[in-house]
Amino acid sequence: MKIAYLGKIQLSDVDLSYLHEAQKLADVDYIMEVNPRFLKGPAFNIGKIYPKSGLFKAVDIYPEMIRLQGQIDLERFYILNTCGRFWLFKSFVTNILLLVFLIRGKYTRIHLAWPPHVYELVLYFLSRKMLLTVHDPFPHTGNDSAIVRFRRKIAFRLIPRLIILNRKQRQDFLDFYRLSPERVIDSQLSCYTYLRSVASDEASFGISGRYILFAGKISRYKGLDYLLPAMKRVHRECPDCRLIVAGGGKFHFDTTEYETLDFIEIRNRFIPDDEMVALIKNCAFMVCPYTDATQSGVIMSAFAFNKPVIATNVGGLPEMVKDRHYGLIIKEKDVDALAESIVSLWRDPELTASFSEEIRRDYSTGEKSWRHIAALLFKEYA
């Protein structure tokens, strides 16, 4: 069996974690797109794009990729590189090169991590061999657009098998897109084990003391407009409780009143892997106060270091954060519920320690491990 895995830099943490196990089971080639729009992601921070367009072995054009040795097979790691002022137009050409590569490779299956962009539509020539992981059965608030809907509609119509990562939204997904049940494969995320290979030093990033963490790209649906007011209430009961907000993106509300508070620190920028790992490893627990969701890579990053999570009762989050086992599930859009849950965990280190132990036990082996998930997906590849 020979598999081509077409990943995205913005999903590289989950891709690398999955491929670490998948490449043990068969020949899996990893092909990742790099262009001026996509140079940074959870596992990559490419400072300068290679000045030629084409399909290359990753280490041949980005020698720094050698750091992934031991995580994935570097001989099977390729970069689809598109550069220059008119990169968007050049992408149509580089994707033709990718199509030729896939045809010559005679792959059994082609696994896509994201619905193809307009400049990738040529890849549908091989649609009969494709599977697609649908990370978001429904677009997040603020991330929907006509072009996104178009890409999803084409993908769901042409790609024979679709993989979803939570069961709660399965029936709604089938009904909304009018899909036959046999086309949709149930799977799940495991913790982002790739992050464990990242060296980090908390002293280098100004990390000290006890704190809780919100991490990830700033988006409207992430619920920071509920978390920041909640922290004012938390501070009245637990003056020593600090929140660090770490992630790039634009706030959709005015944060001026929170920027001067000594118990809230906002790092509103791209957070490289080593800093993110240091922040997660040293926090007491993480908070995901999302107003809508499918599943969450942030939660899987927390679980890589056995950190409990407070999450809201939206989308597939309750499947990921088993209430009172891996953390707490609370009502969404509720400042009081957020404040009460934060105070509860902050005051009870023994409870957070017990949650951490359950995460470590359940995600190391068994049905929540990447080994188990990869084995099940390979049955679908066959």
Feature locations, PLM:
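Nucleotide-activated donor-binding/catalytic signature segment of Leloir-type glycosyltransferases, i.e.
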Residues: 254-278
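Conserved donor-binding/catalytic core segment of Leloir-type glycosyltransferases
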Residues: 204-222, 228-231, 244
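A conserved mid-protein helix/loop that constitutes part of the nucleotide-sugar donor-binding site
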Residues: 13-17, 219-233, 300, 336
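Acidic donor-binding loop of glycosyltransferase active sites
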Residues: 278-294, 307
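Conserved acidic donor-binding segment of nucleotide-sugar-dependent glycosyltransferases
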Residues: 266, 323-324, 328-335, 344-350
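Donor nucleotide-sugar binding/catalytic pocket of nucleotide-sugar-dependent glycosyltransferases
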Residues: 158-197
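A short, histidine- and acid-enriched strand-loop-helix "catalytic/donor-clamping" loop
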Residues: 82-83, 115-120, 130-146, 160-161, ...
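A short, well-ordered alpha-helix in the C-terminal region of glycosyltransferases
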Residues: 337, 344, 351-366, 376
